[in-house]
Amino acid sequence: MAKVLVLYYSMYGHIETMARAVAEGASKVDGAEVIVKRVPETMPPQLFEKAGGKTQTAPVATPQELADYDAIIFGTPTRFGNMSGQMRTFLDQTGGLWASGALYGKLASVFSSTGTGGGQEQTITSTWTTLAHHGMVIVPIGYAAQELFDVSQVRGGTPYGATTIAGGDGSRQPSQEELSIARYQGEYVAGLAVKLNG
């Protein structure tokens, strides 16, 4: 059995929705045990509420537990072309895992969201840098998801990983095409994890 963690941060629910789709895709793979968790919120509760943050039910992960999984699919909103501060804070606590090589050889993939599309690919590739320092095997999705060829509408999604465009005010929710790409990413990564560890 390959253990797959979908680990995300979501303030307004866009990445949470994408995380559920990633997990749904991963759960299609026989021999994959899929867990969905989120990183801790670092914003004070009053400010989080004032900013319109969405309460989420996924359990909170600890950095130490990352060593328990064969594959980790990270989801983060874009903050100026980088991962969110909450995800950065979480990953900055993995120094002990780095020192022991606990994540070396584990699969890693990334999905993201942006307000207007700017920085979605940069967010994924800049997150890869941290994962590479851990010796994780980076898994992009390429162009196997056919939705990536559809240019008839505004759509997130890249060969690096699934993305969604939330709109400047956050009112746009992930489209069916974006969720389909996210499901593909989960299924693809889980399938590789089972082949390597199952």
Curated annotation (Swiss-Prot):
Annotated binding of NAD(+), by residue: Y12
Pfam families: FMN_red (PF03358)
Residues reported in the UniProt entry to bind FMN: 10-15, 78-80, 113-118, 133
Annotated Gene3D superfamilies: 3.40.50.360
Cofactor binding annotation: Binds 1 FMN per monomer.
Reactions this protein catalyses: a quinone + NADH + H(+) = a quinol + NAD(+); a quinone + NADPH + H(+) = a quinol + NADP(+)
Residues holding substrate: W98
Reported cofactor(s): FMN
InterPro entries, per the entry: Flavodoxin/NO_synth, Flavoprotein-like_sf, Flavoprotein_WrbA-like, FMN_Rdtase-like_dom, NQO
GO cellular component: membrane
PROSITE patterns in alphabetical order: FLAVODOXIN_LIKE
Keyword list, A-Z: Flavoprotein, FMN, NAD, NADP, Nucleotide-binding, Oxidoreductase
Domain Flavodoxin-like: 4-189
EC number in record: 1.6.5.2
Keyword Membrane appears in the UniProt entry: no
Coiled coil: none
Main EC class the enzyme belongs to: oxidoreductase
Alphabetized GO MF terms: flavin adenine dinucleotide binding; FMN binding; NAD binding; NADH:ubiquinone reductase (non-electrogenic) activity; NADP binding; NADPH dehydrogenase (quinone) activity
Protein family membership: Belongs to the WrbA family.
PANTHER family: FLAVODOXIN-RELATED PROTEIN WRBA-RELATED, FLAVOPROTEIN-LIKE PROTEIN YCP4-RELATED
Protein name (database record): NAD(P)H dehydrogenase (quinone)
Species of origin: Escherichia fergusonii (strain ATCC 35469 / DSM 13698 / CCUG 18766 / IAM 14443 / JCM 21226 / LMG 7866 / NBRC 102419 / NCTC 12128 / CDC 0568-73)
